[in-house]
Design a protein with these regions (language model features):
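Short secondary-structure boundary/capping segments
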Residues: 38-39
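Extracellular beta-strand-rich solenoid/capping regions of secreted or surface-exposed proteins
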Residues: 42-43
């Protein structure tokens, strides 16, 4: 609770076209190698090192972790992401704030999109080549930026062995970007093309890299895996203390050096523009 309260009260002035950008991603790490933890939380039978799995929501532009779910062993990232979306959407500190949620290709699912739509939240997602058939059809087409209609009937859900209780009909905007390898990357969103042209969608997804940088600092600067406790409750507390330290450091550095430009991650800048439709 202390972590969430301090994150909510911290200054968060930076936005993208008036919107907060929230990236969601997961991180795995090692737990202390005790007999008790090794017996319960090893990733595989051959591996004797117990692990944890954490899924976090990161305010990209303000470089702040605002929510996180800590799980012993391997977790269902989509399930934990859904719980965080519910929590943020109902939190008095966040629910009325304009926000865009960003996900890498391991997260998109019908249920996650339904949840975001039900909460009236905007999103940008990178999708895999085995997503909804309508999105796959767009991938095979020559379109670059196109709105498609999704109709997920009860019959379709049964045939695909998918549990669906949310919105069954909705529109998705598909955006194609070209990677340096020559492959196409498909992003899906519910942001309007007039307000957010293709270049903005690409930039929003590019900014997702901030959460990867945050995880890197947690592991290599805050040393999140260097636990003090050996009990499960204590280990969880140690983890959230690491997030507190990260957020405090961000606030202090931001207030002391507000005008220092950040180093650009050039590896994500090499996306080529495709010709328009």
């Amino acid at each position: 609770e202390l972590f969430e309260q301090t994150a909510a009260s911290a200054p968060k002035d930076k936005r993208f076209h008036g919107y907060h950008l929230y990236a969601v991603d997961g991180m795995k790490g090692e737990l202390p190698k005790t007999p008790e933890l090794s017996a319960k939380y090893c990733e595989t039978e051959k591996c004797k090192t117990p692990v944890f799995h954490a899924v976090s929501t990161f305010d990209i532009l303000n470089e702040m972790f605002i929510r996180s779910k800590f799980h012993f062993g391997i977790a269902d990232e989509r399930e934990l992401a859904g719980k965080m979306i519910d929590a943020v959407a109902q939190d008095v500190y966040y629910k009325d704030e304009p926000q865009i949620w960003i996900f890498d290709r391991g997260f998109p699912s019908l249920s996650l999109i339904q949840k975001l739509l039900e909460h009236r939240l905007y999103f940008v997602m990178r999708v895999s080549s085995s997503f909804l058939k309508e999105v796959n059809a767009f991938r095979k087409s020559k379109y670059v930026d196109r709105v498609i209609h999704i109709e997920y009937s009860e019959c379709r859900a049964t045939q695909n062995h998918v549990h669906s209780e949310g919105i069954s009909q909705f529109d998705l905007r598909c955006v194609r970007v070209k990677l340096p390898s020559g492959e196409d990357e498909i992003l899906v969103t519910n942001l309007d093309r007039k307000d957010f042209p293709k270049r903005d969608i690409k930039e929003i997804y590019r900014l997702r890299w901030g959460i990867e940088t945050g995880f890197n600092y947690l592991k290599n600067a805050v040393f999140v895996e260097e636990f003090v406790s050996k009990t499960e409750n204590g280990l969880a507390q140690d983890y959230f203390v690491s997030l507190l330290i990260y957020n405090f450091a961000t606030c202090i550095c931001g207030s002391m050096y507000p005008n220092i430009p950040k180093k650009e991650n050039t590896s994500t800048r090499s996306i080529e523009e495709l010709p328009p439709d």
